[in-house]
Amino acid sequence: MGRAIGIDLGTTNSCVAIMQGKDTKVIENKEGARTTPSIVALTSSGERLIGAPAKRQATTNASNTFFATKRLIGRQYSDPEMKNLSVPYKVFAAKSGDAWVKTTDNKEYSPSQIGAFILQNMKEAAEAYLGEEVKDAVITVPAYFNDSQRQATKDAGKIAGLNVLRIVNEPTAAALAYGLDKKHGHTIVVYDLGGGTFDVSILEIGDGVFEVKATNGDTHLGGEDFDNGVVSYLLDEFKKSNGIDLKNDPMAMQRIKEAAEKAKIELSSAMETEINLPFITADASGPKHLNMKLTRAKLESLVNDLIERTMAPCKKALEDAGLSASQIGEVVLVGGMTRMPKVIEKVKEFFGKDPHRGVNPDEVVAIGAAIQAGIIQGDVRDVLLLDVTPLSLGIETLGGVFTPLIERNTTIPTKKSQVFSTAEDNQTAVTIKVHQGERKLAVDNKLLGQFSLEGIPPAPRGRPQIEVTFDIDANGIAHVSAKDKATGKEQKIRIQSSGGLSDNEINRMVKEAEEKAQEDEKRKKFIEVKNQADSLVHSTEKSLTEYGDKVSPEDRSAIENAVNELKEVSKSDNIDDADSIQQKVTNLSQLSMKLGEAMYQTSQQNSAENGFSSEGNPNDKEEKVVDSDYQDIDNKEENK
């Protein structure tokens, strides 16, 4: 079995780690950073940029730069959370009803594909570090992700060419990283406020056992919402001052969003920051600049309601675990937003103790995922992880009532069966609608999918016995079966949401990813040969200036023509022209050898004029050494 990696696929940033012996290692990306922005950009030339390079060009390519797509993964376009989505790129309803994204040239991508591009980048970073192919991975998701979102994340891993060993809840992974060396039993809370989601989990840790007692959260609450609060404030203030609404200017909006995020981060350590965006727009009177100061107090007033929203899940998790805040031994902070002083203050106020600050909130989840990979592969022993399902799972019964079969916070993997019957006389088929949530009516909960059990013998209502079995695996993904106990007929399905990616779509995306990898390799070769061409043209032109009069007119003309031909072919942006450029490079390299000979002869003449002739002075030891060196070089040149 090859090495397995742990990946934190975040809304804002992603991170990859690996076990090395008993230690964990966070792997740096190509830019040398330990985290990678979860941003994918498609350029006009067809190039795909991931991470920091994608972020750098976002201002000028906002409509084709996809960020925070984790908020879309596994979601239907009609979901209520989609209404308040504020992004510069196009989000639309795919045929399945899922929320997908679209470029300006109408190329369509599922959020799982965008996630796969980021996972691929993590995979490549790990392979570059290890020097070997990586196939296996543990990927983390927010604890409050539903079945559709978990399945969509697993699909992203498959598209990226990874065998997903396990889907692990982010707070649980963080607890693993925090508590692996803790021997004495105690209860902890993991408060995870990231870029797009909020989770809180309560765990008991002791003697290598990590048992999740309860989990709660909000899959649409995170740093993006804090940024949007600042953006709205800046837009309103600018409109008051200048009478111009910038909401419909994508480039201005992107600049403001970046400035808002930067200001938010700075105010975690400073009391005041200045936002200065020159030439943000223009009107008849000339260019307009956005320049204003933002204090920490003002930021806190803008986002206070968001911080307050994290308290309700904390209360619910404590209730579900049957604990009070005073019974919590440690509060572990995870996610970049937990660096905000007001968040730390609120957590301290709620739990009555200073939060533990000994883990890196940006890296701890990936480290925990790497530990889980080590557990699965047998590299980490004597550790048992008992996670829970975050939401109740059940079916729709008579009258549209939601009947849970597996209650929330049930330890997984788990399996449960219940017998139901028909609602009408002589009913020969039943449709099983599977829902996930906590509301009393099925329609108010998330419909995960449905299937039919047919061929039931006609009988009075209530007599047939239909056994419905729910099986939730360690990934938190459900498998459901229905069986007619009289006939033994059974229908099994792995829950696939009413939307979701079909196997054919996943296979197509896997193939596209493989083809794109080949194209990326061609593009890399193309860039390398263009750089080689530019360098050769520069050095040849420099040599022509200095030594052009030392070669024959015919040779000089041939070299100049070759330089012009290489310049012309190098203007191409078509990656298929790499071989043509390489041929011109080879041709110019061969012709410019004449210049090399001229350079050598000039150097030889200069040496002779300075007294270092081949005759030398037999009575001068230093000249004998020079004479010997000169003869060696001369002989080598003759042998060429």
From Swiss-Prot:
Span list, region Disordered: 537-556, 596-640
Induction context: By stress conditions e.g. heat shock.
InterPro entries, alphabetized: ATPase_NBD, Chaperone_DnaK, Heat_shock_70_CS, HSP70_C_sf, HSP70_peptide-bd_sf, Hsp_70_fam
Residues bearing PTM Phosphothreonine: T197
Keywords, ordered alphabetically: ATP-binding, Chaperone, Nucleotide-binding, Phosphoprotein, Stress response
CDD domains: ASKHA_NBD_HSP70_DnaK-like (cd10234)
GO molecular function, one term: unfolded protein binding
HAMAP family: DnaK (MF_00332)
Record family assignment: Belongs to the heat shock protein 70 family.
Database matches in PANTHER family: HEAT SHOCK PROTEIN 70KDA
Name this protein carries in UniProt: Chaperone protein DnaK
Organism: Wolbachia pipientis wMel
